[in-house]
Amino acid sequence: MPKYRSATTTHGRNMAGARALWRATGMTDDDFGKPIIAVVNSFTQFVPGHVHLRDLGKLVAEQIEASGGVAKEFNTIAVDDGIAMGHGGMLYSLPSRELIADSVEYMVNAHCADAMVCISNCDKITPGMLMASLRLNIPVIFVSGGPMEAGKTKLSDKIIKLDLIDAMIQGANPNVSDADSAQIERSACPTCGSCSGMFTANSMNCLTEALGLSQPGNGSLLATHADRKDLFLNAGKRIVALTKRYYEQDDESALPRSIANKAAFENAMTLDIAMGGSTNTVLHLLAAAQEGEIDFTMEDIDRLSRKVPHLCKVAPSTQKYHMEDVHRAGGVLAILGELDRAGLMNRDVDNILGLKLTETLNQYDIMLTQDEAVKKMFRAGPAGIRTTQAFSQDCRWDTLDDDRAEGCIRSLENAFSLEGGLAVLYGNMALDGSIVKTAGVDKDNLTFRGPAKVYESQDTAVEAILGGKVVAGDVVVIRYEGPKGGPGMQEMLYPTTYLKSMGLGKACALITDGRFSGGTSGLSIGHVSPEAGSGGLIALIEDGDMIDIDIPKRSMVLDVSDSELAARREVELARGDRAWTPKNRERQVSFALRAYATLATSADKGAVRDKSKLGG
């Protein structure tokens, strides 16, 4: 029978000092035999996805204590990728994931907490907490802050739906008036919550459902809706029961590595492909799998991408649907239900509810359930009122979207495409793979051949695009933006956005060893591995080299002879200590970022730290 971790600090005469300090936090004699559960919050006023979380930890804590546990809350950092975008701040985004994972480990292990409730929401916070959960392997429940409502405004006598990406595109479009641009900006992000499309934050919060670590509705129920409060209240109750299952009943099925096993990771990736999730999810799932010592690799992702259909198309791949529409159509479990009926789900997986997948679908898939309370929850909709307050409205759709032929979520027979929304491309440019969000690629662009225009930073690429130096047919190559070469693997949202602003969204391709925002669409290929900073072939491309992209064949090839590439490699190696670094780039890189770069692996490994360099 496992012993409560917290007993290390709460039992025995030698721990009198620790108990004295616990008493100073409000604990009493009666508390010293109870499980101590960490409420891992991420409130900050910097991030709209987290601005409403201040009091939500207290909600969870009250339920923990009412259910027989002791709750202790702490906060992690949280970076807003949208605000950090387009300047040096983006260098810090991906490295913040490792800091979040480490900070959770530090707090939980230093204080011997028995379990966790992770209150996350945005891009690197959910992945960081997920990595920590699988590293620590103690009972955990995830409950996120929820999606933002979609923006709406009236332009040219027509009501249109908006999100952050629209504000960025139209802000750089020379054909859009200042007045219209300002109106779009003011309407794009109307409420608290993670940005309203299937961007990285919402993708990851959906994936925690598929992994079995969060409750039904976690990925899609709006941040502003009163129903979301129940997720927080129930998380507090359920974590105590989950904790006691492990420590008092010796039930290892309550642990995250038992729940989020390889079969669950395959289910999560299958969901991601089917819903056209952010390419960043590939990085984060690979990283989390390594923390949990789960054998889940790029090869698994490639295998799944070839057989999973695209069943749900959401912004940025279309402006018709946002997360509020996914929820109305039944959310994550509706997509999993369609995938299950297509024979694509691993059914023998558990979740924090203590249910198998089939049991969960019978209760929560709107196409199967007879539970009116479940159907009511999925009718939770937007209010269209600007607010930073959680649970501030209780509006509902009159009906559910159960149209699996032409609705937001499709059946296999009516799939948007029989191949899913993400694909892994290989070739001499990416021996270890690269990622493209096929959900956002126009059908006419699935194959592309063009000359390279090479840039050694995002900044110079943006300058060239806005300056008219990139023309139709070009393949924009942005290198030395990988985990090591950046460092920090910046998102290339501005270059892809500005290609659209300049009318080149379907006329050019973009390839990078950096990554993309979940808001990116178009022929944008990222995560090229090995990266330029690690000696990858992307470092040897020259202006004018022809590049062939063939998504159906999963291929990306630089059309340059092996002998020429060998000669270029010799020239690069002759640079000595400066080899595999950008030639003409001025960038201030702090000591903290240099430390990250020293240990960073390429994207095919999840951009995690290289344990071999630490003797691991």
Swiss-Prot record:
It catalyses: (2R)-2,3-dihydroxy-3-methylbutanoate = 3-methyl-2-oxobutanoate + H2O; (2R,3R)-2,3-dihydroxy-3-methylpentanoate = (S)-3-methyl-2-oxopentanoate + H2O. Pathway: Amino-acid biosynthesis; L-isoleucine biosynthesis; L-isoleucine from 2-oxobutanoate: step 3/4; Amino-acid biosynthesis; L-valine biosynthesis; L-valine from pyruvate: step 3/4. Homodimer. Belongs to the IlvD/Edd family. The active site is at residue 517. InterPro entries: Dihydro-acid_dehy_C, DihydroxyA_deHydtase, DiOHA_6PGluconate_deHydtase_CS, ILV_EDD_C, ILV_EDD_N, IlvD/EDD_N. [2Fe-2S] cluster binds at residues 122, 195. Its EC number is 4.2.1.9. GO terms for cellular component: cytosol. Keywords: 2Fe-2S, Amino-acid biosynthesis, Branched-chain amino acid biosynthesis, Iron, Iron-sulfur, Lyase, Magnesium, Metal-binding. Functions in the biosynthesis of branched-chain amino acids. Catalyzes the dehydration of (2R,3R)-2,3-dihydroxy-3-methylpentanoate (2,3-dihydroxy-3-methylvalerate) into 2-oxo-3-methylpentanoate (2-oxo-3-methylvalerate) and of (2R)-2,3-dihydroxy-3-methylbutanoate (2,3-dihydroxyisovalerate) into 2-oxo-3-methylbutanoate (2-oxoisovalerate), the penultimate precursor to L-isoleucine and L-valine, respectively. GO terms for molecular function: 2 iron, 2 sulfur cluster binding; dihydroxy-acid dehydratase activity; magnesium ion binding. This is Dihydroxy-acid dehydratase. It is an enzyme of class 4 (lyase). Its cofactor is [2Fe-2S] cluster; Mg(2+). The modification N6-carboxylysine is found at residue 124. Mg(2+) binds at residues 81, 123-124, 491. GO terms for biological process: isoleucine biosynthetic process; L-valine biosynthetic process. Binds 1 [2Fe-2S] cluster per subunit. This cluster acts as a Lewis acid cofactor.
